[in-house]
Amino acid sequence: EWAKVWAIDHEMLSNELPIILTDEPIMEKAPLLSSPILEERSMRAVELEFLKLFTELFEAYQKDVKNLKRAQQKRELEAMTPGKRRAEEKRVVEWLKGMPQWIEAKTVALTMPMRMEFQLDLIVQEARSAGKTIFVPVTMPDKTLVFVEWNEQTTFKRTSYGVLEPVIDSTHPLFEAKDLDLIIVPGLLYSTKGDRIGFGGGYYDRTLQKVDDYRILSLAYTTQVTPAVDWPVFETDIHIPTIITSEGVVRDV
């Protein structure tokens, strides 16, 4: 079988000349090339290298698309008026109070929101009034989350992501996600099928892989939910089985 090789030269590439694919034995130098050609390789090796490069470029493109969606959604959230925000938050609380997951839960985990995110102060008030214990996440070196109880002694620090996180020491008991009754997952954008774009760290994607759907939900403004998924979805991305907006339960288990 004839060896098929790509004859590639930096000068050729910089001048946007065509890449040569040939079935002929290659001399030490190819015509039009100013430097020695690369070693002859089988077509299979070339295909594998091309596939690897294409995969890397495609994955980078997908990440760029998600980052663009994040930036667009942040602008939309920042443009919401305080009045509209509060009105939607109050309606979401009313919907949440009727959910069996909420009614049954004795422990509830939530993440301290940033300014443009869905605010949870009303949720915290409702949880404390109902006698529920609130937990907040702590980031770990392996980019997963563990949870600690939020009580009157809890103090917070701001992480590199700008999120408030509890300050802990060796005396704080740590809980895994599977130990908690209900986990309210933050996010920037959702589809009506439960797809989610978070903030890019992947912490919840890793942490919730083995948590059953019934105990996972998100709270969102209506502008955060779209019927169409126009962003890349990876196998490692978690789905949100229950999403609640001011208009009701978008998707339920």
Where are these regions (language model features)?
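Surface-exposed, charge/polar-rich loops and edge strands
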Residues: Q62-D64, R75-E78, G83, S129, ...
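Metal-dependent phosphohydrolase cores
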Residues: E1-Y61
